[in-house]
Regions:
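Short, hydrophobic/aromatic-rich segments at coil-to-beta transitions
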Residues: 1-11
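Acidic, low-complexity, intrinsically disordered interaction modules
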Residues: 13-95
């Protein structure tokens, strides 16, 4: 499994059950290798302690190219503080 995590602050904690910080994960689970649709997919997800989550999938090229592009152009550019509005404006959707 490929995976990296970081913690970000949220400016609208009321949407995240009062949490002022949430986890952001970028990953590609091994079981996705078994299907043609997801074998090269990389997912970035903002996660709460409950089932609240906002995500974005990227599946344009091969796995290594997708991973490197997502890390450089999406994951590394997530600001230290985000809002749900920012997530939606940047292509993330409710899970």
């Amino acid at each position: 499994m490929l995976k990296i995590d970081k913690t970000v602050k949220v400016s609208d904690a009321y949407r995240w059950y009062g949490q002022k910080e949430i986890e952001v994960r970028m990953w590609h689970p091994d079981y996705w290798d078994n299907t043609e649709e997801t074998k090269d997919c990389v997912r970035i997800m903002f996660m709460s302690v409950d089932d609240t989550a906002v995500y974005r999938d990227f599946n344009e090229w091969g796995l290594e190219a997708n991973w490197n592009w997502c890390k450089e152009w999406l994951f590394d550019k997530i600001p230290d503080t985000v809002s749900t509005e920012w997530m939606y404006e940047h292509g993330y959707a409710p899970f």
